[in-house]
Structures are given as C-alpha cells and as structure tokens.
Amino acid sequence: MRCVPVFIILLVLIASAPSVDARPQTKDDALASFRDSIKRHLQTLLDARECCPQSPPCCHYYYYGSWK
C-alpha cells in the first residue's frame, strides 16, 4: 500500500511531461546549418541586387567580401 501514492505521482509526472513532438528543434537538426547557409546566401544576393545597379564597387563587395 505504501507504493500506491508513489506510483500515482509517477503516473502524473509522466503524463504531464512534454512529448518528443512538442519539443523545439535543437542543434541536432542535421539541416539547420544548411538552411542558415542558404538564408545568408539568398540575403546576400538580394542585397547585391538592390545595390549593384547604382554602384559597381558595391557589387564587388557583396560577391567577394571586400572592397579590393
């Protein structure tokens, strides 16, 4: 009889724990780095598209990463 309250408490705790699907994605996401890289690349291309028609040196900066 002493184990019944402990067993009930454990059942309540297990039932209230978040499921695997409810947890946010962590660093273990294999594609996270790839997605971040693609977002940065697309943002660079969009920035260059706005800048390049007005200033050719700006294009060189966006495509090569320096003002050389």
Swiss-Prot record:
Entry superkingdom: Eukaryota
Chief location of this protein within or outside the cell: secreted
PTM note: Contains 2 disulfide bonds that can be either 'C1-C3, C2-C4' or 'C1-C4, C2-C3', since these disulfide connectivities have been observed for conotoxins with cysteine framework V (for examples, see AC P0DQQ7 and AC P81755).
Pfam families noted in UniProt: Chi-conotoxin
Chain residues in the propeptide: 23-49
Cell compartment(s), UniProt: Secreted
Residues spanning the signal sequence: 1-22
Entry comment describing in which tissues the protein is expressed: Expressed by the venom duct.
Keywords: Disulfide bond, Secreted, Signal, Toxin
MF (Gene Ontology): toxin activity
InterPro entries referenced in this protein's UniProt entry, alphabetically: T-conotoxin
Entry GO CC: extracellular region
UniProt similarity note: Belongs to the conotoxin T superfamily.
UniProt note: domains: The cysteine framework is V (CC-CC).
Name the UniProt record assigns to this protein: Conotoxin Pu5.5
